[in-house]
Amino acid sequence: MKNSKKSLMHVLSMSILLSLSSTSFAELVNNPSSGNSGTASLNWSSADASQFLNDEDDEPTPQGSTSVTTTLRGGSAPKIVASAPKIAPIRDTSGYNAQPSVSARAALVMDAQTGEVLYSKNTNASVPIASITKLMTAVVTADARLNMSEEITLEQIDFAGANGKNSSSTLRVGDKMNRAEVLLFALMKSENPAAAALARTYPGGRPAFVAAMNAKARALGMNATHYYESTGLDPRNVSSARDLGILVSTASQYGLIRQFSTTPTYDFNLGYRVLKSNNTNALVRNGGWNINLSKTGYINEAGRCVVMHTTVNSRPAVIVLLGEPSTQARNNDATNLLGWLSNLPKRI
């Protein structure tokens, strides 16, 4: 199990990605074993990181009501990378003794290498997934091989929300950052304007981006999944625990998604202000578990959700919890499942 010190060093190594050229960045996305060194373009201190590591940050709370419009940009959409996840077909072997009970509406624990379902609860139910949506947003963004150094300016439309909902945000209209920083905001801090901006600046705009999300889901065999937008605010964004197990296994193959989604804390230097930002998953912030990928989600219709790719006793595993009644219940269930995994026979 890794400790919080290792997690903080993980952030230092991650920050250099933000200053990479588009070519080296694209190579890193699909070649997680490659290494780079240099000076980070965003600065933060270990003392600041320690101060914010245990804060109870969670998903931005949906609030208010706005009308939704979209902006269609010219250009053709990039070719969708439709490779299947490198896991065995999912098969249910959940007859283990002393399985923990969870409060989640749906749950899955899967061996990410063999595809064995170690724990299951309503795994085929199609339910709202809130900001777990942003994991597919990240995959589509990475597949597009766009210039990650390109500057993006947040526009009012990025704050418009979806389906009559918007959410609180520390970002502002007019904030400027490169595409890598936008992706980091979307994964680590679950900022909805960041996810909206990634869709808006995709070739073909939001309609092409959402089409790519659904095409990727179909290509991966996520048959209970459908996306209407890129943030997760729309409760019509639905999936199943089974489908999300496939998505997490796929997303874990992208080095950048792994690093950005498991960054515990980060200072975003926007030039005229610095945003101290924390990961929305307390298990990532607090350390102690070997979590390789993480994404949380919340809207009223979805409840509290989390997906993780972890390694326990040399076993790569996926954990999915959907529809938890509270953040505390979500964290407790995730911790209990991780502990239960650690007591299973070790992989040889």
Predicted ranges, named:
Residues 1-13:
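Bacterial Sec-dependent N-terminal signal peptides
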Residues 2-3, 131, 292, 327:
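Short alpha-helical segments used as structural interaction elements across diverse proteins
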Residues 6-9, 32, 273:
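Short helix-onset patch at the extreme N-terminus, typifying the N->h transition
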Residues 21-24:
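N-terminal signal peptide c-region/cleavage motif recognized by signal peptidases
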Residues 28-35, 41-242, 249-255, 312:
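Active-site-adjacent loops and short helices of periplasmic peptidoglycan-processing enzymes
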Residues 222-226, 232-348:
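Domain-terminus/edge residues, biased toward the C-terminal soluble/receptor-binding domains
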